[in-house]
Amino acid sequence: MLSLLALAVAGPAAAQVWPVQREAEALAVDAAEVARTEGGTAEAALAELRAQGASVALTEWIEGAYRDRLAGLSLDTGGDVSVLLTGRKPVADMMAQAGEATVVVRFRTGAKATRDQLLAAIREHQAAIRAMLARPPAMGIDARRGELVIMIGGADAAGDREQLRKRIERLTDVPVRLAPADRPDGLLAGTAALDAPPSPLVGPVVPGGSQVMGPDPVNGRRYICTTGFAVSDGERTAIVTAAHCPDTLEHIATDGSRIPLPFVGQWGWGFQDVQVNLSPLADRAVFFADTARTQVRQVEHQRGRAATRVGDLVCHRGERSGYSCARVLMTDFAPSGDLCGGACLPMWVAVAGPSCRGGDSGGPIFIGTTAIGLLKGSSYRGDRSCGFYYYMPIDYLPEGWRLLTVPRP
């Protein structure tokens, strides 16, 4: 649910100036946040983040080489790769070079269904599974166990869970596990920087990771969301946020000044939740990552869903929750309810918090200076703390619009 924010009027203000982070500095900041959240040292976290980016080509090769048997692929803490295969024929572990890191690839066998079979089970039986339960559930694929995860709560969780699990398993003919709706427990078991530092960013500008506000046409209340990244259709520049945010939006700068953002369109069916609002001031490929919005990062790269692995570290900035980093839980996730103009497709990515709040919708998902996605929604525990959030991968931007990145040197 979006969060209500009181309307405030601000007068004119002087131009604002923000220092710009490049890739090396941005990764160091993210590594410090990972170390704070998970424990360990910032040095170890930084080494893992570098290996994470460098190992994408390796895991893409593994997925292609073992596609007929692949049940799941995930990253372990430290950056090693775990591969789960169907069948009993063993595959020897291997070591591979990923940038400066040596990555261990461990193979396990004995899974009962491939990833393709698990995805087909969601596509073919999602409606029937929803009909079995009091509330349409979220569902996704546990890449570590090779199981279809159905996330239930309330009356559904209070019933005969084992009988329900068996019913769904008979229907889908794949392994099924039921998990609490507020936490899918068990799922957690580039180019060189320029020699010269980037010039500071001088406002006014409409960056990603900042606040937008607009009225609900039905109840008249004003709601806040978070901007994602700057985009272009080749002629115009714009900023993206979530499609479920208000159509009519104003950008609220850190000094309180406001910039109208004319509405272009929204895409919110099945696998997308993205809205485009125009602004000539969204012509810089920059976004806020820090909670206080004191400095910006340039967008230097992008990484799509196919290159995202369970266990990857990603970060996000939300207008209400601020900045945090955590690990990917599922890359084949279908949110609960009818949040996608009906049932959602299993094409979203779920991340283990640790912070999310109403008003974060549309905010940037990133690591370092790499754009990864836009936050769609969150699941909360009974005490309203953040259980997990989920996002739309950046490669699902609407047709005709592309992500702005800094020019190559």
Where are these regions (language model features)?
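Cleavable N-terminal signal peptides
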Residues: 2-3, 13
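Protease-domain processing segments flanking chymotrypsin-fold serine proteases, especially trypsin-like
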Residues: 15, 38-48, 116-141, 147-238, ...
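Extracytoplasmic low-complexity, Pro/Thr/Ser/Ala/Gly-rich segments
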Residues: 16-84, 196-219, 409
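Short glycine/threonine-rich beta-strand-turn micro-motifs
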Residues: 19-26, 32, 36, 46, ...
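Extracytoplasmic
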Residues: 68, 77-80, 100, 134, ...
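A mature extracytoplasmic/lumenal domain signature
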Residues: 77, 85-89, 109, 143-145, ...
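Terminal interaction modules at protein C-ends
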Residues: 187-409
